[in-house]
Every structure is written in structure tokens, then in C-alpha cells.
Amino acid sequence: MRPSQRRPDQLRAVMITRNFTCHAEGSVLVEFGATRVLCTASVEDTVPPFLRGRGQGWLTAEYGMLPRATHTRSAREAAKGKQSGRTQEIQRLIGRSLRAVVDLSALGERQIVIDCDVLQADGGTRTAAITGACVAVHDAFRKLVTEGKLPYSPLREFVAAVSVGMFQGVPVLDLDYAEDSGCDTDMNVVMTGAGGFVEVQGTAEGATFSRAELNALLELAESGIRRLVEAQKAAIDRN
């Protein structure tokens, strides 16, 4: 039995609240159970030096956790003077995931900066961040279209992410902290709404996993991501 009492194929309660803050072009609070992440998408009329003069846009991401997002307080990385390897890995993953579904050539010389700030962590912060950031980017593009700055949205399709793992010999979906810290295999899967894989990160923690278990985990992730994309679309349709 899972610590959360959920079925193996059951997601945590998912909530996507749009327009959560008033300044960013796109702003979303995404909740996967007790995990809560604020995702904003900001539009900048500039691009990195390597893209200047090419008529193409860019999308990048930053990720961070509030000091008391976890059970015990962690020092702000700004106070330490450098980002951890984990932070750099996650923000690069978020950027790659969103660039996979954005037509950068349709942006013009603009940059979208995604900021994902973890307010409360209970496992799956990177997957929640990707799922929420996609909706924030959608809203930022909608604003640009409404203002007449773009003829159409450069967002080609949705992208979402979920964790899966082997917990006590059973493939389970959307691990919370208790499951993540006690599982034998931990995997993060990023997919598009059309079913294409963007990234698969899998690690054997306590024991190796078989090809059959890998296939079962991927099928479980695919099912979960379909439901997450439905939640993204439902959040957009509400307003």
C-alpha cells in the first residue's frame, strides 16, 4: 500500500490556478497534492547575444525553492553565492521541455523567461514546475497576440511531466516525498500532448529494474501525462 493510500495509477490532486500574480505576462500556481510551485512567464524584448540579428526568439528558465519549502529550513542559494548542481539541472530541464513545444522562430527577437519558485515541496517539484510553466507560457503568448505583437501563439502543443517509480515492487505514479525517498526506482518523464517524449530521467536507487518494469513505468507515465494535459486544457477553458 502506498503511504498516501492512493492507487498505483492515481495522480495526486492537481490544481492549476492562472493569473496568480498581477505583473507577469503569464502566472500560474500549480499544485500536485502538497507540492506547490509558482510559475511565471515574463516577456523580454531582447535575446541572448548568440541570437542577436537572427530574427529568432529564445526561452529560458530559472528554478528555486523558498527556504522553508521543505521540512527543515535550507539557506537561500543567493546567500551562498552559487546555485547547486540540482538547481541548475532542474532549470535546464524546464527550459528544454518548453523549448520542445515552442516555435522560437515565430517569437521575433524576444525572450521568454520562466521562473519556477517552489513554495512547498512534497516530491515532484520539477514535474509540477514543467506542467505549470506550460500554462504560464500559453498565457504570456495569448497576451502578446491580444496586444497585436504576435499574429499567432508560438506554442505548438502542450507539454507536461510526471514522476513514476517502483515502490515496494509495484510501479506507481506521481511520487510524493515519502514514496520518492523510499522507492527502488525513480523516474521523471516529460511528454507532449501529442504523446511524444521530450525527456526520460530514470535512476535505480535501491535495486536495478528490468526492461518489463521500464515499459510499465513508461506506460504509467504516459497515462498520467494525458490526464495532466487535460487538466492544463481545463484550466485554460475556465477563463
Curated annotation (Swiss-Prot):
What protein family does this chain belong to? Belongs to the RNase PH family.
What is the protein's given name? Ribonuclease PH
- What is one GO biological process annotated to this record? rRNA catabolic process
- Pfam families the UniProt entry points to: RNase_PH (PF01138), RNase_PH_C (PF03725)
GO molecular function ontology, one term from the record:
tRNA binding
Reactions it catalyzes: tRNA(n+1) + phosphate = tRNA(n) + a ribonucleoside 5'-diphosphate
Enumerate the residues binding phosphate.
Answer: 86, 124-126
**NCBIfam families in the cross-refs:** RNasePH (TIGR01966)
Complex and partners: Homohexameric ring arranged as a trimer of dimers.
Xref: InterPro entries: ExoRNase_PH_dom1 (IPR001247), ExoRNase_PH_dom2 (IPR015847), ExoRNase_PH_dom2_sf (IPR036345), PNPase/RNase_PH_dom_sf (IPR027408), Ribosomal_Su5_D2-typ_SF (IPR020568), RNase_PH (IPR050080), RNase_PH_bac-type (IPR002381), RNase_PH_CS (IPR018336)
Function, in words: Phosphorolytic 3'-5' exoribonuclease that plays an important role in tRNA 3'-end maturation. Removes nucleotide residues following the 3'-CCA terminus of tRNAs; can also add nucleotides to the ends of RNA molecules by using nucleoside diphosphates as substrates, but this may not be physiologically important. Probably plays a role in initiation of 16S rRNA degradation (leading to ribosome degradation) during starvation.
Tell me which UniProt keywords the record has, alphabetically. Nucleotidyltransferase, RNA-binding, rRNA processing, Transferase, tRNA processing, tRNA-binding
Report which superkingdom the organism of origin falls in: Bacteria
SUPFAM superfamilies, alphabetized? Ribonuclease PH domain 2-like, Ribosomal protein S5 domain 2-like
Q: Which CDD domains match?
A: RNase_PH_bact
Gene3D superfamilies listed in its UniProt record: GHMP Kinase, N-terminal domain (3.30.230.70)
| First-level EC class | transferase
Supply the EC number(s): 2.7.7.56
